């Protein structure tokens, strides 16, 4: 019976590993960012935003703008409030110092 479970486990591994490898290869083609960004106020790069690499080859230019795509699975971003105590916390602090 142990040889049967060993064969079954080996069969599962021979099916699972190629599927995982295929999944990793397909996901590695993505760039890892969303298409919509609430905080991104900059426009797409213009010709002056193109950064040349250290060597003198003109045809090898790198754009300083992130390509945005990751299967659309990242959560939408929402504005983060500014840091600091709220009014409620200020009232608690002031009332405790008065007495």
From Swiss-Prot:
May be involved in floral abscission. IDL3 is only partially redundant with IDA. Keywords: Secreted, Signal. Residues 36-45 have a biased composition (Polar residues). Expressed in flowers and seedlings. Detected at the base of pedicel, in the floral abscission zone and in vascular tissues. GO terms for cellular component: apoplast. This is Protein IDA-LIKE 3. Residues 46-58 have a biased composition (Basic and acidic residues). Residues 36-58, 73-99 are annotated as: Disordered. Residues 1-32 form the signal peptide. One of its GO terms (biological process) is floral organ abscission. It is found in: Secreted, Extracellular space.
């Amino acid at each position: 019976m142990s040889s049967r479970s060993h064969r079954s486990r080996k069969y599962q591994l021979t099916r699972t590993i190629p599927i995982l490898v295929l999944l990793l290869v397909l996901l590695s083609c993505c760039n890892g960012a969303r298409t919509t960004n609430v905080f991104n106020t900059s426009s797409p790069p213009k010709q002056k935003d193109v950064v040349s690499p250290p060597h003198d080859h003109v045809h090898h230019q790198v754009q300083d703008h992130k390509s945005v795509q990751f299967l659309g699975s990242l959560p939408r971003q929402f504005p983060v409030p500014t840091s600091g105590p709220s009014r409620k916390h200020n009232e608690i602090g002031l009332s405790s110092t008065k007495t």
